[in-house]
């Protein structure tokens, strides 16, 4: 029976499947005895079913498991687009279902022991393309036709708006925004939203104010340097004038001292000239 199972249902021998199966100890499960009716229920398919999955056992409320029973001799595979082929290989998720719900399987209906199941899993031939398909089935599926939640829509819209906002700001450099006239800027901003235009104009106003403040600061610093240079020149001139004043004061003191010395020696006074004799009228007539 194990060989027939290995032939009809080839299972992948990928390291992932082997490691997952080895994590479970199949020897600790006991074989549950079921009546022969369970075997008939295992082989019986529901009417109008497109899958090969049989009905679950009457005593179990677990959903129907993947089919590990041989199909009935008279059964014909369905020709629908979703119908699985008769000899199709079970997917890797069936292994996960089998390992997770081992206590719901019917070993008596399968006529298998835990050792036979392990041998069938390990001894199956390896197919690279089938392993790739089985592994791809466990990858997270995209949303597809499902509707995205409002948070995702908001995040996508915010990301798109942020990206569009960055593209608008990257379109103009700071120098272009400052040097561009208002008419030219309005012509360039045609077609953009009002919010983005206001934000860009606010950025331009901020840049112009910053440039004006830097210009005022530069002029103030330049004027300070000019005033400091003038101050230094005036201070040097004052020092020169002070030196000239001190030199003139010394020269004045020297001349004053000479004058005082000459005045102390006492120069002789000049005698007055003699007075002319008085002529009388008699002398005049004589």
Curated annotation (Swiss-Prot):
Spans annotated as Basic motif: 199-224
Superkingdom in the source lineage: Eukaryota
Location in the cell: Nucleus
Annotated keywords: Activator, DNA-binding, Nucleus, Phosphoprotein, Transcription, Transcription regulation, Ubl conjugation
Impact after mutating residue 113 to A: Reduced phosphorylation and decreased induction of lens differentiation
PTM comment: Phosphorylation at Ser-14 and Ser-65 is required for transcription regulation activity and lens differentiation in neuroretina cells. Phosphorylation at Ser-65 may be required for efficient phosphorylation at Thr-53, Thr57 and Ser-61 by GSK3.
Residues covered by region (Disordered): 51-87, 126-167, 265-286
Region (Leucine-zipper) location: 227-248
Effect seen on changing residue 241 to P: Abolishes DNA-binding
Location, primary (coarse class): nucleus
Keyword Transcription regulation in record: yes
Residues modified to Phosphoserine: 14, 49, 61, 65, 272
BP GO annotations: insulin secretion; response to glucose
GO MF entries: DNA-binding transcription factor activity, RNA polymerase II-specific; RNA polymerase II cis-regulatory region sequence-specific DNA binding
Location of the bZIP domain: 199-262
Cellular component terms (Gene Ontology): nucleus
Modified residues (Phosphothreonine): 53, 57, 113
Pfam short name (any one): bZIP_Maf
Role this protein plays: Transcription factor involved in transcription regulation during lens development, including that of crystallin genes. Binds to CRE-type MARE 5'-TGCTGACGTCAGCA-3' and TRE-type MARE 5'-TGCTGACTCAGCA-3' DNA sequences.
Subunit structure: Forms homodimers or heterodimers. May interact (via leucine-zipper domain) with MAFB. May interact with FOS and JUN. Interacts with PCAF; this interaction impairs MAFA ubiquitination.
The protein's name in its UniProt record: Transcription factor MafA
Organism, as annotated: Coturnix japonica (Japanese quail)
Gene from which this protein is expressed: MAFA
């Amino acid at each position: 029976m194990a060989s027939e199972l290995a032939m009809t249902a080839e299972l992948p021998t990928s390291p992932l499947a082997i490691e997952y199966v080895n994590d479970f100890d199949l020897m600790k499960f006991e074989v549950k005895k079921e009546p022969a009716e369970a075997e008939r229920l295992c082989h019986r398919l529901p009417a109008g079913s497109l899958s090969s999955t049989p009905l679950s056992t009457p005593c179990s409320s677990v959903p129907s498991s993947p089919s590990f029973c041989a199909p009935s001799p008279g059964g014909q595979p369905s020709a629908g687009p979703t119908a699985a082929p008769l000899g199709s290989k079970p997917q890797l998720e069936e292994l996960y279902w089998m390992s997770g719900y081992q206590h719901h399987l019917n070993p008596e209906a399968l006529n298998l022991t835990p050792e036979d199941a392990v041998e069938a899993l390990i001894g199956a031939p390896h197919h690279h393309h089938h392993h790739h398909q089985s592994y791809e089935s466990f990858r997270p599926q995209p949303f597809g036709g499902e509707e995205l939640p409002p948070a995702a829509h908001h995040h996508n819209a915010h990301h798109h708006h942020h990206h569009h906002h960055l593209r608008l700001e990257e379109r103009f450099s700071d120098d272009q925004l400052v040097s561009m006239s208002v008419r030219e800027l309005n012509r360039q901003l045609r077609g953009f939203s009002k919010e983005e235009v206001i934000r860009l104009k606010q950025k331009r106003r901020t840049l112009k104010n910053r440039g004006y403040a830097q210009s005022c600061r530069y002029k103030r610093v330049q004027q300070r340097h000019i005033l400091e240079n003038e101050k230094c020149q005036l201070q040097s001139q004052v020092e020169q004038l002070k030196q000239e004043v001190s030199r003139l004061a010394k020269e004045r003191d020297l001349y004053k001292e000479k004058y005082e010395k000459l005045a102390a020696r006492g120069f002789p006074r000049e005698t007055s000239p003699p007075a002319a004799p008085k002529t009388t009228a008699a002398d005049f007539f004589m």
